[in-house]
Amino acid sequence: ASYKVKLITPDGPQEFECPDDVYILEHAEELGIDIPYSCRAGSCSSCAGKLVAGSVDQSDQSFLDDEQIEEGWVLTCVAYPKSDVTIETHKEEELTA
């Protein structure tokens, strides 16, 4: 299956279809969409975003705690879409503040 992903970036919204077995960051990059990242392994906060709608599987991540996940934080480098999703990107400063 694939789902509609909407990324709300500082440059405006970007929408694309993303297969449910491809990380959101990886697919965005293939489409030329610029999202920050560093480790690509779910163990830092560079790619952090805020889930506005929908759900993701980010079970490979090791950085966020349960409370942050409940608040809607998502690491796009290890997040698979599990429904149509809307994510605000470029949120690392807010997460680590």
Curated annotation (Swiss-Prot):
Residues 3-93 form the 2Fe-2S ferredoxin-type domain. The keyword Cell membrane does not apply. One of its GO terms (biological process) is ferredoxin metabolic process. One of its GO terms (cellular component) is chloroplast stroma. GO terms for molecular function: 2 iron, 2 sulfur cluster binding; electron transfer activity; metal ion binding. Belongs to the 2Fe2S plant-type ferredoxin family. This is Ferredoxin. The lineage of its organism: Eukaryota, Viridiplantae, Streptophyta, Embryophyta, Tracheophyta.
